[in-house]
A protein has these predicted regions:
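Long, hydrophobic, amphipathic alpha-helical segments used as structural scaffolds
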Residues: 30-33, 124, 184
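Non-catalytic interface/linker regions that flank or bridge core catalytic/transmembrane domains
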Residues: 1-105, 174
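Divalent metal-dependent catalytic cores for phosphoryl transfer on phosphate-bearing substrates
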Residues: 99-102, 108-109, 135-190
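Helical mechanochemical/support elements of P-loop NTPase systems and associated helical scaffolds
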Residues: 14-18, 58, 112, 165, ...
Length: 190
């Protein structure tokens, strides 16, 4: 019925990488996730340890969702609501529900970052062509989508830590980008 369900309750315990795979499959096939599967993901997100974080397949699945040409915003939001996102990217967990108090930001840092990915995807798809014609043209000329999407996700990752969040964010990017599978040139660009 258009919703992704789990075959049995211990599904994630057998292979915690499946936590990422569930979201990637939902994105790939345009499916919603059954509420029981979301509850299981939230319960089992604790299974995401350093081994899962460093797992190349898990990182590839995450990058697939982040750079999806479909609806990355919705799927990233589901990942965030289930706590899988913050468990997989611990630096993101630090900005969940963090308020920003200035005239440019109307959302918490996590929601702002997820929404930024959504806007990028909408510009790329042409949905915002009338409102953002120049951005739509420029988007077609981007050399590396994944660099742009990763950079967009990480642009405020170090907010609230004291000091210049762009400098602190650079250190996070230097560690996270190779883990996600970006090469040295892509990492430097981010």
């Amino acid at each position: 019925r258009g919703r992704l369900a789990l075959p049995h309750d211990g599904y994630f315990e057998e292979d915690p990488v499946r936590l990422l795979e569930m979201f990637q499959l939902a994105d790939l096939h345009g499916l919603e996730i059954h509420p029981l599967a979301m509850r299981a993901a939230q319960r089992d997100a604790r299974l995401i340890d350093r081994a899962v974080q460093r797992n190349p397949r898990a990182n590839g699945l995450f990058l697939d969702v982040l750079c999806s040409p479909r609806d990355p915003e919705t799927v990233l939001r589901w990942m965030n609501e289930s706590t899988v996102f913050g468990r997989f990217i611990p630096d993101f967990r630090r900005v969940v529900a963090q308020m920003q108090f200035d005239m440019y930001h109307h959302y918490t840092v996590d929601e702002h970052s997820i929404r930024a990915i959504g806007l990028l995807a909408e510009i790329e798809s042409g949905e915002l062509k009338e409102d953002h014609p120049l951005s739509t043209v420029i988007m077609r000329q981007i050399v590396s989508r994944r660099v742009l999407f990763v950079a967009t996700l990480l642009h405020d990752i170090a907010k609230g830590r004291g000091g210049d969040h762009s400098v602190l964010g650079e250190e996070i990017a230097k560690n996270l980008c190779p883990r996600l599978g970006l090469n040295p040139a892509e990492t430097e660009t981010v």
